[in-house]
């Protein structure tokens, strides 16, 4: 059995798990899967709220009761910047600020931090395959991927999974907009778990 690790997840509705039970949030599902591989997780600390932009997450972190260092830190943010029509050019400096904080929370060890792509809410009943939404999500994710590359941290792409939401209705929560617990499980099992297990070896 390995030593227990602590996990800090930073984000918005996609991290707090809007419209799903707490145990179905992807950070909680990841912790359970890690424990199945003999990696206990002592704490899952989530700083996230539905509707938060990068600026609001920054303020939320300042107000949060945190106990760093954390062994693992995730960052999934940006959909609400896109949804509110903020210029994608303003996203990079705000994302870099948050990523630098995430690295600091990981004892200044970037190898313990990962970025998760923004899911595409176009593929939900609420938006019905909107091309303009998908284009906006692609633009934001391109910035996020570049920042991850520049900082040498993993960029985990779950966007393609989210794009199955119209063909597989069970991947969308009852609100017709957010991912279901089943979709979050696919994020973990198909993409996140593999990367994180390599990170904590």
Which role fits each region the language model picked out?
Residues 14, 51-53, 120, 162:
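Residue-level detector of flexible, active-site-proximal loop/helix-junction positions
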Residues 18-19, 55, 84:
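Short N-terminal helix/helix-N-cap motif within the alpha/beta-hydrolase-1
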């Amino acid at each position: 059995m390995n030593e227990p690790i602590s996990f800090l997840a930073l984000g918005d509705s996609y991290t707090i798990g809007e419209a799903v039970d707490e145990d179905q949030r992807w950070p909680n599902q990841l912790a359970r899967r890690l424990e199945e591989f003999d990696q206990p997780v002592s704490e899952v600390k989530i700083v996230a709220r539905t509707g938060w932009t990068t600026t609001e997450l920054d303020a939320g972190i300042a107000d949060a009761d945190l106990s760093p260092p954390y062994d693992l830190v995730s960052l999934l943010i940006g959909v609400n910047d896109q949804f509110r029509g903020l210029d994608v050019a303003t996203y990079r400096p705000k994302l870099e600020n948050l990523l630098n904080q995430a690295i600091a929370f990981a004892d200044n060890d970037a190898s313990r931090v990962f970025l998760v792509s923004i899911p595409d809410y176009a593929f939900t009943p609420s938006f019905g395959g909107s091309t303009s939404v998908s284009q906006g999500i692609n633009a934001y994710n391109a910035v996020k991927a570049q920042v991850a590359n520049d900082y040498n941290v993993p960029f985990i792409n779950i966007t393609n999974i989210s794009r199955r939401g119209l063909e597989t209705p069970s991947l969308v929560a009852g609100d017709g907009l957010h991912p279901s617990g089943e979709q979050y499980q696919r994020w973990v099992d198909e993409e996140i778990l593999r990367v994180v297990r390599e990170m904590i070896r």
